[in-house]
Amino acid sequence: MSSSVLLAIDIGNTNVTIGTFAYDAGAGRLGEHWRLSTHREETSDELGVTLRALFDQAGIDPRRVADVIISSVVPPTLPIWERVAAKLFD
């Protein structure tokens, strides 16, 4: 069985960096990682489609995501990414 995954999202002024960390025996190791451009006007639906496509391309089942951590230095984007996480992983 595949281990569960922590999804880390770091929203910066220029880029959004996303990484997955697999939980193995209590320790996380970096799995896939991606870098997207930060766009303040993107909707949660658009970002959700993008994130789902990245997961599909990497062969990651979104149901494996057990936890999501989001950090942001761009306050207007935080609620958008929170909605993405709630829609895809709750």
How should each PLM-predicted stretch be described?
Residues E46-R52, W81-A86:
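Generic preference for flexible, low-structure residues
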Residues M1-S2, I70:
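Intrinsically disordered, low-complexity segments
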Residues T17, E42, A53, A66, ...:
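A generic structural micro-environment signature
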Residues A58-D90:
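Short beta-strand-loop/turn "lid" adjacent to the catalytic site in phosphate-handling enzymes
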Residues S2-L51:
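Short glycine-rich, Thr/Ser-proximal phosphate-binding strand/loop in the N-terminal lobe
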Residues A27-G28, R52-D56, L88-F89:
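Short, low-complexity, polar/charged sequence segments that are solvent-exposed and flexible
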Residues L47-R63:
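A short, N-terminal amphipathic alpha-helix
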